[in-house]
Amino acid sequence: KSINRDYIKYDATIQNMINHRKQMQEDLVKALENNEFMMYFQPQYDVLENRIAGFESLIRWNNPKYINISPQEYIELAEKNGLIIEIGNFIVKDVFKNAKLFEPYGIAISINVSPAQLFQAGFVGFLLEEFEKNKLKPGSIAVEITETFLMENFSVVIEKLNILRNHGFRIHLDDFGTGYSSLSVLYEIPANVVKIDKSFTDKVMVDNKGEFVSQMGKFIRAAKEEIVVEGIETEEQRQFLESHGFEYGQGYLFDR
């Protein structure tokens, strides 16, 4: 509906969107009951040594109605209605079991963790329990958080991440460069890896944007952290990584 002084005009588009989200919320509950979620592992590639160096776990909804929509849409809805906790627990259990299979190759798998999960009472303990239950070795699992995550409650986030790192988890800082934190955060967060956001990768071949990304890499390396450049989709972008000393890349060029 749109309001214009003396009358209200019905807007079918808005109503359809409301109905769509309501239906999706109902289907999310059924999806958990019917085991419709599955995990997909996107490789993080070592462009210098030409090998797979790690994987990021990504959730997919095996339902004809939602198979082609971005996971971000239903994950955001799950965060709002509280289902993210149950979905997150499924992800942890599935990924930790798979991580055991990759251990002999020295390859870590990362899981994306939302603020709702990390701030949930007992979540860190749950991660530690599953880690122990699957008899995983230190370095087998990486917890991935976004840069904007740090704005929620910085000191609490750092405390929880330190606990995880001290118990053998790797820490990945995702979407770096898209938030409002200063470069000093690189020295405060206990991260092993910083992931440069795709929005920067898209522009490395435009004007002097590549030089900016190169300088960003120098700051990150100065903080003693590894770098994964996200959104690598072309051979030109891969060559940029190699020529500027970026060791790891992730994106559709390596695997869809």
Where are these predicted regions, by residue range?
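Catalytic core of bacterial c-di-GMP phosphodiesterases, primarily the EAL and HD-GYP domains
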Residues: Y7-D11, M17, V47-E56, N81-V157, ...
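Regulatory and interdomain segments flanking nucleotide-handling catalytic cores
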Residues: S2-R5, R21, L48-A53, P71-E76, ...
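EAL-family c-di-GMP phosphodiesterase catalytic domain
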Residues: V47-L48, P64-Y66, A99, S114-A121, ...
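Active-site core of bacterial EAL-family cyclic-dinucleotide phosphodiesterase domains
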Residues: K9, T13, H20-L77, N112, ...
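Conserved functional hotspot residues or short segments at active or partner-binding sites
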Residues: K160
